[in-house]
Structures are given as C-alpha cells and as structure tokens.
C-alpha cells in the first residue's frame, strides 16, 4: 500500500498515541484497530487536527473472483474496528487486492451500502496448559 497510496505510513507507537489523543480515542481499547494512516499534509509533524490525516484499516485479498474492487471482497472485522469506523469521520476501510496491485478506500456510509451479508464470529483462545484435576470446574 505504501507504493500505491500517496501519504500512507505506519505510525510508530508514539505517533499512534498522539493521533489517538488528538482524536479523543482510548488508546488502550483501540490500539490495534488501525493499521496505518494517510497523511493529508506533507509531513507527520504538520498534523494539527483530524482533517490532516485519515486512519486506514487494511484488509487484503487475492481472490480470483474479485475482478473490480470492492465488489466481491470478503474479510474479517473486529467489533472495535467497526465501532471506531462508525464513530470517526477520518477512518477509512481500505481493501487491497495483492494480485491486481490495486486498492479501494471507503468511508462508513459506503461500507454499509456495500454489505451483502454480515455475521458474528467468536474468536476463542484456549488455556495454554492443563489444569490439575482439583482445579477443574464441577459439572
């Protein structure tokens, strides 16, 4: 995406924290809800307001059935990503087709208009070690 999108960059942790503070976003809750930014000014140090940049959430595909972006794209989206997308005018969803070497960037309203279907999926992390028998819950 760096080669395709003018002004795209992946901010450092400190840069990300300063942007979140500027926009009134809880960094601890949403720290992983943005992949990069697109600068609308010439340099990161010139960012003064939300109008100076866009938050970019990147979703990639190499699907053969996707001939023209964004049509036919399939991706996962966390609740936090979608909540931030809905609440921030300077948040963009960017779908990158790695085979076509193209991207499509959209705002929340366009995203809503393009959804064909949407379902909730839970992500489960199991314990990393076995519990002793006396620590197991009673059934």
Which residues does each predicted region cover?
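Acidic-basic catalytic patches of nuclease active cores, encompassing PD-(D/E)XK
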Residues: 1-23
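A general structural signal for short secondary-structure junctions and capping/turn motifs
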Residues: 18-19, 45-48, 82-87
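Conserved catalytic cores of phosphodiester-cleaving nucleases, focusing on short active-site segments
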Residues: 27, 36, 52-64
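Active-site beta-strand termini and strand-to-loop segments that position acidic
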Residues: 27-42, 46-49
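Short, flexible loop/turn elements at secondary-structure junctions
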Residues: 29-31, 60-62, 81, 97
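Mg2+/Mn2+-dependent nuclease catalytic core
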Residues: 62-87
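Domain-level recognition of nuclease-like catalytic cores that cleave nucleotide substrates
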Residues: 85-139
């Amino acid at each position: 995406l760096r080669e395709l999108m003018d002004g795209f960059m992946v901010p450092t942790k400190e840069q990300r924290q300063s942007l979140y503070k500027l926009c009134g976003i809880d960094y601890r809750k949403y720290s992983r809800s943005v992949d990069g930014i697109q600068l609308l000014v010439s340099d990161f140090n010139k960012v003064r307001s939300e109008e100076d940049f866009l938050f970019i959430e990147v979703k990639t595909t190499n699907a053969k059935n996707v001939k023209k972006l964004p049509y036919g794209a399939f991706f996962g989206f966390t609740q936090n990503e979608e909540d931030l997308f809905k609440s921030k005018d300077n948040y963009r969803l960017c779908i990158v087709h790695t085979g076509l070497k193209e991207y499509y960037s959209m705002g929340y309203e366009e995203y809503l208009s393009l959804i064909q279907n949407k379902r909730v999926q839970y992500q489960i992390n199991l314990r990393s070690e076995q519990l002793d028998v006396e620590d197991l819950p009673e059934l």
